[in-house]
């Protein structure tokens, strides 16, 4: 389903770059997670999935600056040259708690996302500054970074305006891909796992088992992988099974192909 941002919508029978596509995104790519992300990419390649979107955090939790890590830079350069897409994924991937936060804000940013909803309520100015800093930190990469995806998909109204003004071509939410250049929205629910607690794992496995069946006939299927998923046997087994089944009749492509 394609929805125009003005509220109109129509079925998407054969849109360029969308038909029978599979987008696999690796979240939280940083110097801290480089080794495990590399193992994930190796296993995906064994499944025939050789192009993904890599969601890069410029300075994870203020303690892993990409700009100071030449080994990570070279690793990312090599991955991009082999066909993977770099995507800006916040700046710190962390939102500091405010004593003025409402109950809704606390539930959203601390329970739902464990304090990582960085772009949930940033001002336009602060969001712009972090976006520009992130692009500067990733300037060692050749080519334009066309996508920005907020941590936990929590992108406030002013922050989204900053993303548009900075020239990004798209962003995503958990339920859609928003293409700024086309002023439209591809409705597609991302499959994503949570392994922070036992009950979250059980809920994720049940939810994605059902959702995996529902999305089989959709034009676009999205799979979001976080580094901890790889270390949880049940979650990773389900991910591999889904990808094996979905990749048979779908073209694996990064988000950037949808916005081109």
Model segments located where?
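Active-site beta->alpha N-cap acidic-glycine motif
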Residues: 2-85, 140
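C-terminal domain-boundary segment and adjacent tail
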Residues: 11-16, 52-56, 170, 220, ...
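Hydrophobic faces of well-ordered beta-strands that scaffold small-molecule active sites
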Residues: 22-26, 52-54, 86-89, 145-148, ...
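Acidic-and-aromatic substrate-binding clefts and catalytic sites of carbohydrate-active enzymes
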Residues: 29-36, 58-71, 94, 149-158, ...
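Short, solvent-exposed beta-strand-terminating loops
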Residues: 86-104
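Active-site gating loops and adjacent loop-to-helix segments of metal-dependent hydrolytic enzymes
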Residues: 100-124
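Catalytic domains of cell-wall/extracellular-matrix polysaccharide-remodeling enzymes
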Residues: 118-194, 231, 236
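A conserved mid-domain beta-alpha-beta active-site/ligand-binding segment of alpha/beta enzyme cores
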Residues: 186-234
């Amino acid at each position: 389903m394609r929805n125009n941002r003005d509220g109109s919508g129509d079925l998407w029978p054969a849109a360029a770059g969308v038909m029978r596509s599979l987008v696999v995104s690796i979240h939280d790519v940083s110097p801290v997670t480089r080794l495990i992300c590399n193992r994930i990419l190796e296993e995906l390649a064994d499944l025939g999935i050789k192009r993904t979107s890599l969601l890069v955090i410029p300075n994870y939790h203020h303690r892993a600056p990409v700009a100071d890590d030449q080994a990570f830079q070279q690793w990312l350069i090599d991955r991009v040259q082999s066909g993977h897409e770099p995507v800006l994924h916040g700046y710190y991937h962390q939102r500091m708690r405010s004593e003025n936060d409402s109950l809704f804000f606390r539930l959203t940013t601390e329970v739902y996302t464990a304090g990582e909803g960085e772009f949930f309520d940033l001002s336009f100015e602060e969001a712009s500054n972090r976006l520009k800093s992130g692009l500067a930190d990733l300037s060692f990469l050749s080519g334009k970074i066309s996508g920005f995806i907020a941590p936990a998909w929590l992108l406030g109204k002013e922050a989204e305006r900053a993303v548009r003004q900075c020239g990004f071509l798209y962003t995503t939410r958990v339920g859609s891909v928003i293409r700024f250049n086309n002023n439209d929205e591809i409705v597609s629910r991302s499959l994503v796992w949570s392994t922070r607690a036992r009950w979250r794992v059980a809920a994720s496995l049940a939810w994605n088992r059902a959702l995996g069946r529902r999305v089989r006939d959709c034009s676009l299927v999205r799979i979001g992988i976080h580094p901890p998923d790889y270390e949880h046997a049940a979650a990773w087994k389900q991910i591999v099974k889904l990808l094996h089944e979905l990749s048979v009749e779908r073209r694996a492509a990064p988000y950037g192909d949808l916005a081109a």
